Amino acid sequence: MMNMQNMMKQAQKLQKQMEQKQADLAAMQFTGKSAQDLVTATFTGDKKLVGIDFKEAVVDPEDVETLQDMTTQAINDALTQIDEATKKTLGAFAGKLPF
């Protein structure tokens, strides 16, 4: 019985630590960039879009497709950074579970 109580206490402790790491991650910002940094997209760690910036050189009414492609590239870059940071930050908890 005592062993089960210890496991529960350890699990609760890990849960609190994980919640803190999730909050820390959510407070961080990640900026994805397109080729030549012509488009940047900034997200919080919980994947909320904070802003998109376009360099003047990429804004061409005759070539909207390039702007769309660069925007997609910047967004995907930022989301990949968030996913990698999440795995690095929260993945460590998987090996610490008491069961």
UniProtKB/Swiss-Prot annotation:
It comes from the Bacteria. The keyword Calcium does not apply. It holds the Pfam family YbaB_DNA_bd. GO terms for molecular function: DNA binding. Keywords: Cytoplasm, DNA-binding. InterPro entries: YbaB-like_sf (IPR036894), YbaB/EbfC (IPR004401). Its main location: cytoplasm. This is Nucleoid-associated protein MGAS2096_Spy1605. It comes from Streptococcus pyogenes serotype M12 (strain MGAS2096).
